[in-house]
Regions:
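C-terminal extensions of enzymes
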Residues: 153-223
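Glycine-rich phosphate/ribose-binding loops and adjacent secondary-structure elements
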Residues: 1-150
Length: 223
């Protein structure tokens, strides 16, 4: 804060593993914004065992993070941004209803820009992958020319066309989320709350802390 003369907000990004405790630590440290990243993000920039077995899904992490903020009287004061597995407007609406202030995307934006396109299949096979399966964006060899510093690969990205595709994707995502809010009788996306949600399985009801569909039962919380 001193370096920026208190002009820049402090973002703290944490992986979703024990969000109840980690969010409280971030708030006590003075974070303005907490970015909570779930295990379902698309990166391959870590060990396989971490990708498959470390962290929890973002929709099970949000209730814990919100509870921590509420107990500290900081919900909506310290912003909560969630990411990791956010792909469409339904994901956005669910996250907002559970108490997030905003969402962030990564892999979804890359796909919208043109990564993993079928036309790249031959190039992807040369590096041991295939269209729809490439996720080694950290190695700088992205055949789509997006996540690379290689000047030759970078030429493959048409920023105008890519920007148009990304804008279309974001526009549709927003419209989907807004439509879901209206279906719940809400005039604004930020008016969604947990009462607008139910779960279709016992497991998802327990993780998200919302009632099982057709009941008022929240597993582990109410009778």
């Amino acid at each position: 804060r001193e370096i920026t003369d208190w002009e820049k907000p402090i973002y703290v990004k944490i992986g979703a593993s024990r969000p109840y405790y980690d969010v409280k630590l971030a708030v006590k440290a003075g974070a303005d914004v907490i970015v909570l990243d779930g295990m379902q993000g698309g990166t391959a920039a870590t060990q396989e065992v971490f990708i498959e077995h470390v962290g929890i899904p973002i929709l099970s992490a949000i209730p814990q993070a919100v509870q921590a903020l509420q107990e500290m009287g900081m919900h909506r004061k310290v912003q909560l941004i969630v990411s990791g597995g956010i792909r469409n407007g339904a994901d956005v609406a669910k996250a907002m209803a559970m108490g997030a202030d905003a969402v962030a995307i990564g892999t979804a934006a890359l796909i919208a820009l043109g990564d993993n396109h079928p036309r790249l299949d031959a190039e992807l096979k040369k590096i041991g992958s295939a269209a729809g399966f490439y996720d080694d964006w950290q190695n700088g060899r992205d055949p789509a020319g997006i996540t690379t510093q290689d000047p030759e690969l970078s030429k493959r990205l048409d920023p105008v066309e890519g920007g148009r595709r990304l804008a279309n994707y974001l526009r549709v995502m927003v419209l989907e989320a807004q439509t879901m809010a209206r279906a719940c009788g809400k005039s604004h996306l930020h008016n969604l709350d947990p009462e607008d949600l139910v779960a279709l399985t016992v497991e998802s009801a327990a993780m998200a802390r919302v009632p099982l569909a057709g009941t008022s039962w929240i597993p582990g919380s109410t009778c």
